[in-house]
Amino acid sequence: MQRRIAVVAVFVMIALAACASASKPSAGGTTPTPTSSPAPAVTPTAAPSPSMSMSVPSVSPTVAPAPPAPKPAPPAASTKPISCTGEIAQTRPVASGTGPGGSLVSTGSPAVALTFDDGPDPINTPKILDELKQCGVKATFCVVGFRARDNPEMITRIAAEGHTLCNHSWQHLFDLAKRDDAYIRKDLENTNKMILRAAPGARVAYFRAPGGNFTTKLVKIASELGMNSIYWHVDPRDWESAKFGKGTVMVNHIIAAVERDVRPGSIVLSHDNGKPDTIVAYRTLLPWLKARYTLIALPDAPPSPAPGAPLP
């Protein structure tokens, strides 16, 4: 029994010695580390050089749409004085005929009358007045009643500088002739009232229907108020910018139309209200016209009747 115990003890000692030997690192050895999966090898890709043959898809650049063409600006009005000298003989036939409703289209003499409608305009009317003064020319201004009320200083200046004032209705209704007689009469009387308030010594001897839409009834009522009805012989259509454009193209159109159509005795229609191209065109037209024609304001007639009651 004792022998067996001794043998077992020997084996236990041998086992313990083996365990102790395994737990110590060997000389020059390293402490083992946990094993991990190796990182995949990455082969760097070189950027293609210009010499490398590669198929590169072409990319069309995105082109922004072109901006819209700017609207033509009115030509800048020159401040240089206009020279209206010289004299050129002309042999064109005298203007004749009558307008709608028996209205006048000519002056009844070889003289030419320039007329400016729809004002007074606080911006453009002073400019055309300045041009007329530089050339020593008188004209006729067919003014709208409510604009005469709102710009009395312009009416005062027109009269003071020797131009003729013309009634162009209260608010430029194209269908004025279709209104009843009482309305038409009040419309014209109130327009005269505003003109005479600003220029007490003036005479309102003429009437022009809005759009030239005369009827015999309209002509008759104007006559009863002491006014002759005037149409025109030359219309450059300076108001039709939708057809003729704006800026330089309109200026050139106005000049060409007036020079082509004017005759001795012509009444020429133009517009000062909101028409800067017309003002620029007359810097060229005034010297051209004055060299060929006598330019007049339509002559005054007896004083207009006293204005009636205001419009309701």
Task: Tell what function each PLM region has.
Residues 172-199, 213-264, 280:
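Alpha-helical scaffold elements lining the catalytic groove of polysaccharide deacetylases
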Residues 258-299:
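Catalytic grooves of carbohydrate-active enzymes
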Residues 127-128, 153-157, 217-221, 281-285:
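A short acidic, amphipathic alpha-helical/loop segment
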Residues 2-9, 13, 19-114, 121-130, ...:
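N-terminal pre-catalytic segment of deacetylase/amide-hydrolase enzymes
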Residues 135-136, 198-201, 225, 288-293:
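Short helix-capping segments at alpha-helix termini
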Residues 72-179, 183, 187-200, 204:
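Active-site beta->alpha N-cap acidic-glycine motif
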Residues 112-115, 139-143, 164-169, 205-209, ...:
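Structural recognition of the beta-strand scaffold that forms the well-ordered cores
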